[in-house]
């Protein structure tokens, strides 16, 4: 096989991610790579909060359909946007080395989250972020913020918000930090990220010749950490649009796992932090989810969906 076709969204970040994988493949193999840009449902419907659009795979479905029709061979996703179940004929074949997994406080007026005045307007579409912000500061006004990163930063500069919350990885990949007055990453204890945050997931057609070309992209620590995170979410049957945070942080032979599930308004939540040996990572995400279920996580998520 001497050519691969990547189905990609047309946003600046999606194109950066696809070009990054394109360069990796072309620099490490004899394979030529072509990009095919398209729009997904999540790109087109910009006036509705993601949770209200409903369904999983808002940013992946059209790319998957292109692969299933035989028009493309793979797609590069922010792993946090990738559902835990794949259509028949497609497979998650590689997970890249992770960029910064943290969420960041971004503002033109206030130097830190703690400096926000009472009733400040904070922009985010993520129910996970909304929940964790309101746990800390129930007085904040959390306002839906859609669009690509540049659109969100423009709205911030136009004073629509006192601050916005963004994934650090996207800001770093697009070198946007110098355009921001105040950029402060939350610690992992302050704001637990989404499953897979900071990693790129390579989804491809389930064909051995394609899988063989792509497997060199796999990063062992990324695979271990995101396996824990995705297993946790899969057991809870949670998609990208429910208030679930989970992160596995690897340091040497130790993994710290942080997880949170709750209501979007932050009024009720279940939170835990565990430390395990790297050798024990298999099935740990599922076991931790079982413990959350025994503490009422499924009922909490059902109520969260009704509130969203």
From Swiss-Prot:
GO CC annotation terms, alphabetical: cytoplasm
Residues annotated as transmembrane: none
Keywords: Porphyrin biosynthesis, Transferase
Superkingdom, taxonomy of origin: Bacteria
Enzyme class at the top of the EC tree: transferase
Catalytic activity, EC: 2.5.1.61
Pfam families the record matches: Porphobil_deam (PF01379), Porphobil_deamC (PF03900)
Description of how the protein assembles with itself and partners: Monomer.
Note: The porphobilinogen subunits are added to the dipyrromethane group.
Name used for this protein in its record: Porphobilinogen deaminase
Species for this entry: Campylobacter hominis (strain ATCC BAA-381 / DSM 21671 / CCUG 45161 / LMG 19568 / NCTC 13146 / CH001A)
Lineage of the organism: Bacteria, Pseudomonadati, Campylobacterota, Epsilonproteobacteria, Campylobacterales
